[in-house]
From Swiss-Prot:
This is NAD kinase. GO terms for molecular function: ATP binding; metal ion binding; NAD+ kinase activity. The gene is nadK. GO terms for biological process: NAD metabolic process; NADP biosynthetic process. Disulfide bonds: none annotated.
């Protein structure tokens, strides 16, 4: 019997409502469910199914929210590699797979086994010890607004750039459509075995984004004394970086797993980022 986890933004009424309807739909079809314990505070009728996300044991997890909900969920179940099916309640939701109006037809397809599991590259991060891995990106930025960092970037022990900038983004192909894109980085097909190095507002005309092999080891060193920085991993975790500290990035041995009902990456680029996505968002 299939077991499906349900996680939703409990601060968004529509997401909570969809979670309730999804739970009822699955139970009526004989599917076992487990529900985020915090979500059951909004849906007390599902309390018997409540479980901490970290302890969830499921064949698949449904997230009802945006990309942030997916990133948070993935960080909490990192060691389990449970496939995630994202239902989009956010603005763009590039990591999500299903819009709210198609939720139940998508679930019918899932129950018929008409889906694939896509594996996405993760970025391992080290600062003294191993930090949580990143699905999208790691952002190194100053702790103080309007202050620049002085950083050295090395790839496979070769210095490729030294610059002053507001920060630096180390991104995966999955993250190429997120903060990296906003900072001027390219969109990269998730099948490409690469990492992106994207400066944020560099004080150097020649500084440009770099695309490097994901077999490479990237090192970023903070050079200027007295300028502390923070490393932000997928917007979920922060680590303080001090003068002459080095942050190391390499491809993780683990993967993130996503439920996919279609494989058209470029259709998603058109729909979410051009035709009906970012370019059409107002105010």
């Amino acid at each position: 019997m299939m077991r499906i986890g349900i996680i939703a933004r409990f601060d968004v009424a529509e997401a909570v409502e969809i979670a309730e309807r999804v739970a009822s739909f699955l139970l009526n079809r004989g599917v076992e469910i487990t529900v985020d314990l915090k979500l059951t505070e909004e849906l007390p009728q599902l309390r018997e199914y409540g479980e901490d996300i970290r302890n969830m044991d499921a064949d698949m997890i449904l997230t009802i929210g945006g990309d942030g909900t997916i990133l948070r969920t993935r960080s909490l179940i990192e060691d389990k590699e449970i496939p995630i099916l994202g239902i989009n309640m956010g603005t763009v939701g590039f990591l999500t797979e299903v819009d709210p109006e198609n939720v139940f037809s998508a679930l019918e397809a899932v129950l018929r086994g008409e889906y694939a599991v896509e594996k996405r590259t993760l970025l391992s991060v080290y600062h003294n010890d191993e930090l949580p891995s990143a699905l999208n990106e790691v952002v190194l930025m100053t702790r103080r607004p309007a202050k620049m960092l002085h950083i050295e970037i090395s790839v496979d022990d070769e210095v490729v750039e030294e610059l002053r900038a507001d920060g630096i983004i180390i991104a995966t192909p999955s993250g190429s459509t997120a903060y990296s894109m906003s900072a001027g980085g390219p969109i990269v097909d998730p099948r490409v075995e690469a990492f992106l190095i994207v400066p944020i507002c560099p004080f150097k005309l020649s500084a440009r984004p770099l695309v490097v092999s994901n077999k490479s080891v990237i090192r970023v060193k903070l050079l200027r004394k007295g300028k502390k920085a923070i490393a932000v991993i997928d917007g979920q975790y922060e680590e303080e970086i001090n003068h002459m500290d080095e942050v190391i990035f390499r491809k993780s041995e683990r993967k993130a797993h996503f439920v996919r009902l279609s494989k058209d990456f470029y259709r998603k680029v058109r729909e979410k980022l051009i035709e009906g996505g970012i370019d059409s968002i107002k105010g």
